[in-house]
């Protein structure tokens, strides 16, 4: 996968960036995404993610991850359904905005390592970019076990 990492905080250690890239690459393989699939991860402060949450979700609080999936339907644009394949264009699945501050707070609250929480945050957002959700029970029973399987197989067990 082609993962663009943007660190607006300017303080994310290289080891954490590597963990993010590795866990997302692993998750992409589990979902059998094309190797040229694109996405971005932007690290922001609690204040910035609170602003994004307020602007796009009308919720005035910081959160760990906000996902913006690109849900393009080529057929709606008058293009063939396999447009990306026909023209060898990588599929961009979207963008994640992540607060490491919030992830650290949650790791402490839940009593597990920061690395586990960071992996959880990444996989959770990644699954949202790929159409998974947990609002309704019938969706949750698909997303949550898959999320746990990816984390466990990657080595980030509870």
Swiss-Prot record:
Output the InterPro entries linked to this UniProt entry. MetalPrtase_cat_dom_sf_prd, YbeY, YbeY_CS
- One Pfam annotation reads YbeY
Offer an example of a GO molecular function term for this protein: RNA endonuclease activity
Q: From what organism does this protein derive? A: Latilactobacillus sakei subsp. sakei (strain 23K)
Superkingdom is: Bacteria
The text of the family note is: Belongs to the endoribonuclease YbeY family.
Q: Does the keyword Manganese apply?
A: no
State the taxonomy lineage.
Bacteria, Bacillati, Bacillota, Bacilli, Lactobacillales
- A cellular component term (GO) from this record? cytoplasm
Name this protein carries in UniProt? Endoribonuclease YbeY
Keywords (alphabetical) are: Cytoplasm, Endonuclease, Hydrolase, Metal-binding, Nuclease, Ribosome biogenesis, rRNA processing, Zinc
Q: What does this protein do?
A: Single strand-specific metallo-endoribonuclease involved in late-stage 70S ribosome quality control and in maturation of the 3' terminus of the 16S rRNA.
């Amino acid at each position: 996968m082609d993962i663009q990492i943007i660190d607006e905080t300017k303080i994310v250690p290289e080891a954490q960036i590597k963990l993010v890239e590795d866990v997302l690459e692993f998750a992409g393989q589990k979902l059998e995404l094309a190797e040229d699939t694109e996405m971005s991860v932007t690290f922001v402060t609690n204040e910035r993610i609170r602003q994004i949450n307020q602007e796009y979700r009308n919720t005035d609080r910081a959160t760990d991850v906000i996902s913006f999936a690109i849900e393009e339907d080529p057929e709606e644009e008058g293009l063939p359904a396999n447009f990306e394949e026909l023209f060898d264009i990588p599929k961009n699945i979207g963008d994640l905005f992540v607060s490491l501050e919030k992830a650290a707070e949650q790791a402490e609250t839940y009593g597990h390592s920061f690395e586990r929480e960071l992996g959880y945050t990444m996989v959770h957002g990644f699954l949202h970019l790929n159409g998974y959700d947990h609002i309704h029970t019938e969706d949750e029973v698909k997303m949550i076990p898959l999320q746990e399987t990816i984390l466990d197989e990657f080595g980030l067990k509870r």
